[in-house]
């Protein structure tokens, strides 16, 4: 027990597991916990470390989790293994890079039936940038379609890792887990750092707990930390007294002190996540370290969309839900906004598309709020005639055409991994999305890595869905924003009876504006119910209408009660109806159904 509370530094191993979705990362973590008797049969459940219901259901890891594992080797020595479970998705890249900074090594888990995928590659490169020792692990060898030699060759070719010592396992059955634990102890380095130096610790995750305030996960690089110490955070300069200090093994265990190389958690009446940012440095107030740990950056949202309650009476429920979600997700931002078409709602910012999907799903699932979401948008930069540069995250905020000198849009560097038979489909899709081809590589016989530079706005819309359907679900992709470039962009407005609908405005490339406007007008014609008066649907750039559709009026037979008789009587009734319709058209409001907004979101299906 003493070894668990006060381990010898050279007997500590901090490691993370890198894997693509469904390659077996959480399953391997489960088996390690079972093999080391940390989780009893009674407590067993799949994906033990994935606390969120949504994480278990989608089979992905969204937040980093950690567990301290005491392990006795074959020769009787006790080691402490700290597993830091990282998210694998590109949207959470910064969280991954901070989690990797807290470790010295990684297990690279690859599904032998699938091979190397794009997100695996992205995270391996991150690990190698952090000077990690990487152990390749070949998973799912119990499946008949496993091709171990081919995958080994692919890893050596694409990543450059020596696979002669790669460990073959089946995380599902537990085969080979003992070899993995021995390899962690033998091949990964012990953490460096001096317990007698001033405290320097890295925050790699934090979340909000209703009873204790913010819980901070950290890794100590130098120094020692004790309960009741007063700590200071570098980026905010705020100080807190530690009220609770401990480790997860896998449930929380209180510990009086932790020192260099160890991973743990602390609570200290920290009120908001913004005060304990991922990547920040913790030190002691009275004996601080001089330099922060490098690599800290403020996370900025890159994708925006409007979220509105479908019932306006749910506005306060949605607001409370957003406040609650923000407590546990510092990367998610929101501010109130109003739309003439949708009423009161919120403009929300996300790290990427998966992040946006997860937030929307959690709002609907955990808080039972029905949402209307507007089309996602990225941040554009506008240079206006007065020489200023503005950032625009909402198409309706774009200045008038006459005031714009240049419009800049973000570009991304994208790597797409795809079986060779689908290369033609992927190239066609990327060209259609205004892509610039950079490279095509063939790391293995049947696999291709296609590299493109694409406008980010083309990706946020429907790129991923179309990529999956063009490749029968076999493609995987990884992207990062690289720079802003001048583009010939315009704002396309949709007008109903001459009135612009702000929630349907989009920024598109001028070459695509006509096709987009025409398609959307046709879709709206199908989804907006007929009214008692004619409805004109127009797509316009500034004052110029580029497409128009009309929904004809419902006709009530006002002459039904005239039996034969005078034609002037009928004409009088018809004229009266015509006048009434004119007045209605002038006064009438066209109710936009939810389907109209869905039509705008599904524009890529044409």
Curated annotation (Swiss-Prot):
A Gene Ontology BP annotation from the UniProt entry: positive regulation of translation
Chief location bin: membrane
Positions with a binding annotation for GTP: 22-27, 139-142
Topological relation to the membrane, as annotated: Peripheral membrane protein
Subcellular location: Cell membrane
GO MF term (any one): GTPase activity
Reaction catalysed by this enzyme: GTP + H2O = GDP + phosphate + H(+)
Gene3D superfamilies: 3.30.70.240, Elongation factor 4, C-terminal domain, Elongation Factor G (Translational Gtpase), domain 3, P-loop containing nucleotide triphosphate hydrolases, Translation factors
tr-type G domain span: 10-192
Keyword vocabulary terms for this entry: Cell membrane, GTP-binding, Hydrolase, Membrane, Nucleotide-binding, Protein biosynthesis
Keyword Cytoplasm: no
EC number(s) from the headed UniProt entry: 3.6.5.n1
Any Pfam family hit: EFG_III
InterPro entries: EF-4, EFG_II, EFG_III/V, EFG_V-like, EFTu-like_2, G_TR_CS, LepA_C_sf, LepA_CTD
GO cellular component: plasma membrane
NCBIfam families for the chain: lepA, small_GTP
Family in the record: Belongs to the TRAFAC class translation factor GTPase superfamily. Classic translation factor GTPase family. LepA subfamily.
Function: Required for accurate and efficient protein synthesis under certain stress conditions. May act as a fidelity factor of the translation reaction, by catalyzing a one-codon backward translocation of tRNAs on improperly translocated ribosomes. Back-translocation proceeds from a post-translocation (POST) complex to a pre-translocation (PRE) complex, thus giving elongation factor G a second chance to translocate the tRNAs correctly. Binds to ribosomes in a GTP-dependent manner.
Protein name in UniProt: Elongation factor 4
Native species: Lawsonia intracellularis (strain PHE/MN1-00)
